[in-house]
Amino acid sequence: MYPAHLLLLLAVCVSLLGASAIPPLPLNLIQFTYLIECANKGRRTSFNYADYGCYCGIGGSGTPVDKLDRCCKTHDECYAQAEKKGCYPKLTMYNYYCGEGGPYCNSKTECQRFVCDCDVRAADCFARYPYNNKNYNINTSKRCK
């Protein structure tokens, strides 16, 4: 084997090792994204909710800053209930469809139905309440006590 081939093989192996260290996204995150966009008729993408208030996004603490943030807290609590039932809400794939009235669940197993219901209720809640740009990317250490 030529030295250039060895270098190329080494580069491929190193990049594969690096890629294997990247944690995967939760499997149902894409589904939740579609449910959000279905519920609000495309007015806002799911990215608007990734870092909103004290509870939208990873983790959560303190008092929700508004009704929209309360939707995220309720969604977190719903996922906690799913885990108590032995479900894995961030990994559970489910069947749903987007109708004129918004998203609907169409899943067979109890865990799929429960997790889908959590996500549909959150998506509908997001669509129901106004979005306040001032609550996006807030300083959670100061405002979420």
UniProtKB/Swiss-Prot annotation:
Its cofactor is Ca(2+). Keywords: Calcium, Disulfide bond, Hydrolase, Lipid degradation, Lipid metabolism, Metal-binding, Secreted, Signal. GO terms for biological process: arachidonate secretion; lipid catabolic process; phospholipid metabolic process. Disulfide bonds join 38-98, 54-144, 56-72, 71-125, 78-118, 87-111, 105-116. Its EC number is 3.1.1.4. One of its GO terms (cellular component) is extracellular region. GO terms for molecular function: calcium ion binding; calcium-dependent phospholipase A2 activity; phospholipid binding. The keyword Transmembrane does not apply. InterPro entries: PLipase_A2, PLipase_A2_Asp_AS, PLipase_A2_dom, PLipase_A2_dom_sf, PLipase_A2_His_AS. Ca(2+) binds at residues 55, 57, 59, 76. It holds the Pfam family Phospholip_A2_1. Binds 1 Ca(2+) ion. SMART domains: PA2c. The active site is at 75, 119. It catalyses: a 1,2-diacyl-sn-glycero-3-phosphocholine + H2O = a 1-acyl-sn-glycero-3-phosphocholine + a fatty acid + H(+). It is found in: Secreted. Its main location: secreted. It comes from the Eukaryota. Residues 22-27 form a propeptide. Residues 1-21 form the signal peptide. Belongs to the phospholipase A2 family. Group I subfamily. D49 sub-subfamily. PLA2 catalyzes the calcium-dependent hydrolysis of the 2-acyl groups in 3-sn-phosphoglycerides. This is Basic phospholipase A2 PC17. It comes from Laticauda laticaudata.
